[in-house]
Every structure is written in C-alpha cells, then in structure tokens.
Curated annotation (Swiss-Prot):
It catalyses: dCTP + H2O + H(+) = dUTP + NH4(+). This is dCTP deaminase. Its EC number is 3.5.4.13. Pathway: Pyrimidine metabolism; dUMP biosynthesis; dUMP from dCTP (dUTP route): step 1/2.
Amino acid sequence: MSIKSDKWIRRMSEEFGMIDPFEPNQIKEADGKRIISYGTSSYGYDIRCANEFKIFTNINSTIVDPKNFDPKNFVTVEDDCCIIPPNSFALARTVEYFRIPRNVLTVCLGKSTYARCGIIVNVTPFEPEWEGYVTLEFSNTTPLPAKIYAGEGVAQVLFFESDEICETSYKDRNGKYMGQTGVTLPKA
C-alpha cells in the first residue's frame, strides 16, 4: 500500500471525478486576505468546510445515544462561520464530494492550525467505493468559544492505494453512509 502524490490526486479528480469541486493548487488567500489553506498538497488534499453546521445543545436534556440518536440534540446553523461553545461539539460537511476508487482507502487528519487552538477535527477513513459529502466532527477542547470557518481548509485527506483489490467494498455491503448529501447524523 502506498501513499499517492499530487499528480495522482490531480489525475483521478480531473479524469474520474474523485473530488468535486476539485482545486488543483494550494489556496492560501481569498479576496486579498490569508485563509486556512485548502486544495492539493504534495501527498494529500486539504478539504473545506461548507456553511452547514449542527451544534450540540443541552436545551432538551436528552441522552446522547448512537443507537437511538435524537436530532433535537443539535441546533442547525447556516453561516460563514460556526461558534462552538466551550468543551462542546459540532458537525459540518465538506464542500467537496468524494468518489473513492475500489483500490483506495483514505485517512483524514485535522489541520494543525485548528489543533493548535484546541479544536480537534475527527473524520473516519473513506472506504473503497464510498462516495458522498464527508461529515466532519469538531471538538472544542478549550474553556472558550471556538470559531470554525466555512469555505476554508479544516483537514487533510491522504490517499493510499492497495496492492490488490478488496473482495468487498463499502458500496458492495451497502454502507449506511453511502451517498450522504448533507451533515449526516449517527445511524445504527
């Protein structure tokens, strides 16, 4: 299994729609201002956060149960940024839609710009033949409110190509998060 380069990521995205929309360069400025970078890097792709957020709330005092998740645990916000309360959590989705080849597995890591502020980005691997918008999980580990910017980089996806094709892909087993189009809540 080997990590894939910028040339491979560019070719797979431009010829096969692996990432859509795809940015072939590393973007660090918008409207003359510095932003948290996104786009193609040497051995990965920095994904952006869309402007759709779900922020945890305790207004309804329900229990967080991954097998029986109550959507009332979240407040939905659509904005250019999201303020996550201290020691709290939010979900978002990527701007980019992914189509992962059958012989590829990705690992997604949060950007250090956010990590250095106490904001942890968690994303599970994108499995072979999974496709959809990625649901992003943000944890604010600080005692202060934390800001997430829509349209800017939040995490980096690394692509690993296997030496052989898997017997059963995510698509083959009808994975429950296949084709997700927005922020997707837990499914048991």
